[in-house]
């Protein structure tokens, strides 16, 4: 990834990654040109059975199959159980594209 280039993030559990997530990725990539996918640590429960590594592998396989280049078009970063986003600057654009009605 070009660390100077405009980037957007996708934050979630992605348990599992599915077509609506891929659609969200396509939209984010179209709008910003590169995406950091932040995988919330949520391993080992009945609701969240997949490990970060399993989810990351599946996401990479899916997006590469779609024609995106890992480490150039997108990267994956494990993160703790983030429950809120805070920003002290108005220079950051906060957008919300919901896919909850499909889950």
Sequence positions of predicted segments:
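Nucleotidyltransferase catalytic core that binds NTPs
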Residues: 1-103
């Amino acid at each position: 990834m070009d660390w100077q280039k405009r980037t957007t993030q996708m934050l979630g559990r992605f348990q599992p990654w599915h077509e609506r997530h891929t659609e969200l990725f396509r939209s984010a990539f179209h709008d910003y040109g590169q995406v950091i996918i932040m995988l919330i640590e949520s391993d080992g429960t009945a609701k969240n059975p997949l490990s970060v590594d399993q989810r990351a592998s599946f996401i990479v396989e899916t997006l590469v199959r779609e024609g995106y280049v890992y480490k150039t078009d997108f990267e994956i970063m494990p993160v703790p159980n983030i429950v809120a986003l805070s920003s002290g600057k108005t220079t950051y654009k906060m957008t919300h594209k919901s896919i909850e009605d499909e889950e």
